[in-house]
């Protein structure tokens, strides 16, 4: 090693759109550097979570430290952080990039640039990173490297003349990627202070070790036995062990400046080491914390309730442990008349919500009911106060509301020219307003302002179906905008079910109410009495359907006989049904709560 220990360190992330081959390229890099032996190698070795492997997507950013002997004869220490590509997990990307000096932008040579590659690349450029374009999948017969290079220059605006063309699947030319990393990505720079500063990139909970933190040491060094100060909480913890992932966990004697590794300090409190925080020495603290990364705001809210009320404390504990590993998750206790005690949770999007529910059910063995997701609205009350509302059931009475504002997003859609008409039609159906259309080589960029409520539910699926899977979407929050919104309540036998309330645009209210009643009629099982399902805005009923009662034939045993005998039996049955209806409760199945989702948002 040279006299400057940081000179031969390279910290880099891999950024790309979903399915462009990030994780496969990471596998090849690990293989070439000898991080794992051949028998330990498996596809997508960094996607360690079973849900990631099943869905074929990366959810959590993973890190790995490798040694590489370059063609110039020197040994280089490479720290690779694999990042997710889905729009819901873009915050994971920005966290990973904060710990790097460079990024590999992987583009599928057969598909060209897609929206998420653009968004992630802009994030990298904003943070001042060196971006190295990589063209992947050149082994495919449909690969067109020249077109992909032209698109990178036209759509993203970075020079692609020196882009490295590889096939991550076969390993062709991957060595050139390693050389490009060594030559083009800068080494870590010393900070303006001599004192220890380490940025927490990620944390997770281990039942034996407590909180394990993944850190990037910016300045100074961490050795076991040091007392570390967590700068935001002001608490000190003694370091038990430090090390790196190779991708296996490997213990080291110390972590020095420029390195990315893990630290354990017997922190048993789940909130002990928040992500984005700075670690420094208790005895000699740094003057100020490192700039962290933006707090991410959840956009989609839903209620999570345990099927069995006794699981409530377990659900709280599971959510706290998951929150440590997933900084974007928010939750607060909620009480629902229909569902009992549970939590109101905030997510980044529908995929994030599905993944969280799946992780809770699998990793913590919980049985959960989820209510229909909703976005956050702003309500301006008549007394001038502005309240944020993430739960339709908590909306103030109509006479106290001055205006309701919904969140508007700006979406960038990249699509082949053949499907522009279909994309515009879809956006207009979703109450969108067009900002502009730009033709870029073989792709068209369509920019729209759209209501977030229309986008989070099923917009992505519909966009894929109208463009046969070719379009890609990226969006970010813009502002809140006033509109004519109402709350549609669902009444079952005259009782309002708070978990089924939805906020909709006034023009869509009657249709949504009618469709909801029809859907619920199919899902609620028949009872011994008629069940009335009504949709209402305030006290005005806008639609109704009835689940007919099951009826026992009480006249079966009266063969002939007097008509008054039959009348008496029928009257008796009628009385019983009336009494049953007064005290009878209707069990609402889980499917009924999700029926709100399935109503087509035309």
Curated annotation (Swiss-Prot):
It catalyses: GTP + H2O = GDP + phosphate + H(+). NCBIfam families: lepA, small_GTP. It is a peripheral membrane protein. It is an enzyme of class 3 (hydrolase). It is found in: Cell inner membrane. Keywords: Cell inner membrane, Cell membrane, GTP-binding, Hydrolase, Membrane, Nucleotide-binding, Protein biosynthesis. This is Elongation factor 4. Belongs to the TRAFAC class translation factor GTPase superfamily. Classic translation factor GTPase family. LepA subfamily. GO terms for biological process: positive regulation of translation. GTP binds at residues 19-24, 136-139. Required for accurate and efficient protein synthesis under certain stress conditions. May act as a fidelity factor of the translation reaction, by catalyzing a one-codon backward translocation of tRNAs on improperly translocated ribosomes. Back-translocation proceeds from a post-translocation (POST) complex to a pre-translocation (PRE) complex, thus giving elongation factor G a second chance to translocate the tRNAs correctly. Binds to ribosomes in a GTP-dependent manner. GO terms for molecular function: GTP binding; GTPase activity; guanosine tetraphosphate binding; ribosome binding; translation elongation factor activity. It holds the Pfam family GTP_EFTU_D2. Its main location: membrane. Coiled coil: none annotated. GO terms for cellular component: plasma membrane. It comes from the Bacteria. InterPro entries: EF-4 (IPR006297), EFG_III/V (IPR035647), EFG_V-like (IPR000640), EFTu-like_2 (IPR004161), G_TR_CS (IPR031157), LepA_C_sf (IPR038363), LepA_CTD (IPR013842), LepA_IV (IPR035654). Residues 7-189 form the tr-type G domain. Its EC number is 3.6.5.n1.
